[in-house]
């Protein structure tokens, strides 16, 4: 897998998203996953922007070749939006697209955009997401021991609530 980073310092979210999408589409490799980092001011703005990102990618790519898209509320340095894009190094023999994961050459699973209701307690969000991961692994006949890279984003990761630190709850 190859990774590329695209930045946009455009003045507005809309223009930055347009620039990121154009940069991803310019690459001759097949984009498999796009993780976009931005700085929404609230959960409501985050949800609105996430829907906007998902719509932009649905309009830009047909379902059978649409990259997985995730939006992370983490302010990028010196940019409005930053995208980490995962590309496959060579032309794969097969790619099976699902809603929140892709199977490459019947050998690799790439997931992205696994979300839970952001109004839920952090522990419940974690339970929901890990249940979905377990479902994907079960459907594909893969053991959790075969996970190579797992990357979690937890809102207010260092906050401490009466139940404990958000990171520990996750």
Where are these regions (language model features)?
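Short, polar/acidic, helix-capping and beta-turn segments at strand->helix junctions
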Residues: 1-170
């Amino acid at each position: 897998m190859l990774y590329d980073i695209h930045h946009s310092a455009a003045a507005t979210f809309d223009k930055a998203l347009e620039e990121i999408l154009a940069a991803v589409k310019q690459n001759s490799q097949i984009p498999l996953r796009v993780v976009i980092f931005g700085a929404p001011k609230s959960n409501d703005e985050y949800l609105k922007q996430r829907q906007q990102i998902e719509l932009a990618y649905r309009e830009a790519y047909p379902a059978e070749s649409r990259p997985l898209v995730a939006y992370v509320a983490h302010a990028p340095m010196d940019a409005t939006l930053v995208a980490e894009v995962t590309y496959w190094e060579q032309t794969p023999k097969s790619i099976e697209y699902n809603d929140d994961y892709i199977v490459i050459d019947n050998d690799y699973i790439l997931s992205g955009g696994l979300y839970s209701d952001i109004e839920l307690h952090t522990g419940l969000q974690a339970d929901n997401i890990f249940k979905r991961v377990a479902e994907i692994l079960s459907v594909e006949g893969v053991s959790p021991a075969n996970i190579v890279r797992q990357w979690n984003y937890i809102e207010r990761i260092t906050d401490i609530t009466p139940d404990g630190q958000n990171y520990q709850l996750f």
